[in-house]
Amino acid sequence: MVGTLDMDFTKYSALAVEDDAGGMAIIGVMMRYLGMQAYLNTTGDGVVELARAMKPRPDVIFLDINLPKTNGYEILKKIRTDEKLKGVLVVAVTAQDADTEIPKCMAAGFDGFIGKPISRSRFPRQIRRILSGEPVWETY
């Protein structure tokens, strides 16, 4: 699969923040299958600190919008104001209504949007596009 996507994923790292076990499993398995270094967080607590401590720094953060103690918009604000995390791509991942959430995510400064449920067949290509600098704003 890696060869067909024409990208060496092994040089990239990602952080996925997702409170749903099923969604987390799909994201984690897909990133690891591609060869990416993957870190997972299920609550949203300490995301900025975790991202800052990652070695290497994450290239992309997949961030759920609805988390138990906070939301993706609040976490994004913290990421965007952190000097050490400047330039990290942040992609919203949510099951919320795309027609409502995509404009909000764009306005908030997300680098992309992937709707749930995550498609196992499309997710690797979405990751490739994101890491190549192409915005992804897709409902699934």
List each model region and its residues.
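The feature encodes the CheY-like receiver
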Residues: 68, 86, 98
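Conserved acidic carboxylate
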Residues: 18
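Short hydrophobic/Thr-rich beta-strand motif most characteristic of the beta2 strand and flanking loop
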Residues: 35-44, 48-50, 114
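Two-component/phosphorelay signaling modules centered on CheY-like receiver
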Residues: 21-40
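Non-catalytic signal-transmission and effector/linker regions of two-component phosphorelay proteins
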Residues: 1-15, 28, 57, 121-140
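Active-site beta3 strand of CheY-like receiver
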Residues: 56-62, 67
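Hydrophobic/aromatic residues positioned on beta-strands within the core alpha/beta folds
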Residues: 91-93
